Curated annotation (Swiss-Prot):
Catalytic activity reported: (2R,3S)-3-isopropylmalate + NAD(+) = 4-methyl-2-oxopentanoate + CO2 + NADH
Keywords noted in UniProt: Amino-acid biosynthesis, Branched-chain amino acid biosynthesis, Cytoplasm, Leucine biosynthesis, Magnesium, Manganese, Metal-binding, NAD, Oxidoreductase
Cofactor: Mg(2+); Mn(2+)
EC number, as in UniProt: 1.1.1.85
NCBIfam families noted in UniProt: leuB
A Pfam family reported for this protein in Swiss-Prot or TrEMBL: Iso_dh
Gene this protein is translated from: leuB
Organism: Xanthomonas oryzae pv. oryzae (strain KACC10331 / KXO85)
Any one GO cellular component localisation term in the record: cytosol
Lineage: Bacteria, Pseudomonadati, Pseudomonadota, Gammaproteobacteria, Lysobacterales
Protein name, as recorded: 3-isopropylmalate dehydrogenase
Assembly notes: Homodimer.
GO molecular function, one term: 3-isopropylmalate dehydrogenase activity
Co-factor binding comment: Binds 1 Mg(2+) or Mn(2+) ion per subunit.
Its job: Catalyzes the oxidation of 3-carboxy-2-hydroxy-4-methylpentanoate (3-isopropylmalate) to 3-carboxy-4-methyl-2-oxopentanoate. The product decarboxylates to 4-methyl-2 oxopentanoate.
Annotated localization: Cytoplasm
Amino acid sequence: MSKQILILPGDGIGPEIMAEAVKVLQRIDTQHGLGFELVYDELGGAAYDKYGSPLADETLERARAADAVLLGAVGGPQWDTIDPSLRPERGLLKIRSQLGLFANLRPALLYPQLADASTLKPEVVAGLDLLILRELTGGIYFGQPRGNRTLDNGERQAYDTLPYSESEICRIAKAGFEMARLRGKKLCSVDKANVLASSQLWRAVVEEVAKDYPDIALSHMYVDNAAMQLVRAPKQFDVIVTDNMFGDILSDQASMLTGSIGMLPSASLDANSKGMYEPCHGSAPDIAGKGIANPLATILSVAMMLRYTFAQADAADAIERAVGKVLDQGLRTADIWSEGTTKVGTVAMGDAVVAAL
């Protein structure tokens, strides 16, 4: 079996956190005899600086050839003024769409050692373990037509389009039901079917797919209510499935229930479990180069990669246990530090996880 992984450190803190994730990957590779081949390239702003494009053609070909892609983060203020079509984020959108990565998995898991880090009361979030499944290659971020125009009265207007086809909804719905079957057998589909035509089709197709999953309890919720319920009573959810834009917003909201977005990994999968794995957080240019970024989300993304693309559950479990051990030792990066714990930097945190394996 081919086991090639494309490493894309990206921008901002990306190279720093990726270095620690690769250390962990290499240790687990040695321990379990997995035989991975690591290939390196650039994406985002770093790719624009090197190639003149946020995603070079040769990088895309390397991504197609690899079995999995591990990404740091993209973006930064130094690229804010370039042509919008060349912005770092466009490279991220393009690689997702070109690889057919339609299912984005964003877990929100509260580590008991970090219960005090959440802004919500401990009794509201203790034991939180939910998964948001976001459709990633359709909807308003890719819909056409989109653009800017000047109206007859001289006023500027901008417009976007939110299309979803039956097949796009069907495949993400099936993925949602399958994930729910592996977890708590509850699926909540989030839409805005009281207003949007695309959401009305979304709800209808999800209902049709549900007939093949009689063992899963399906519910529907409008996105505004879902945002409120995530704060009011987040433990009511097991798996949430939703469209691209709603999932983008709700998954960031859910991440803060856990106290730090620096703890949360994500996976973006195609129909055959090939995936791109990355932390939920951004490139954090304000702390780039300071050696204080939290690498745990990227390290946990490695665990997701081992679990979902390479079917190495034992190796994935080992990484997740090692992260738990490090937290038990009281080691914290600045974003999750609290009184009575030991503040460490990026490299020290990565070394601690390697030592705990």
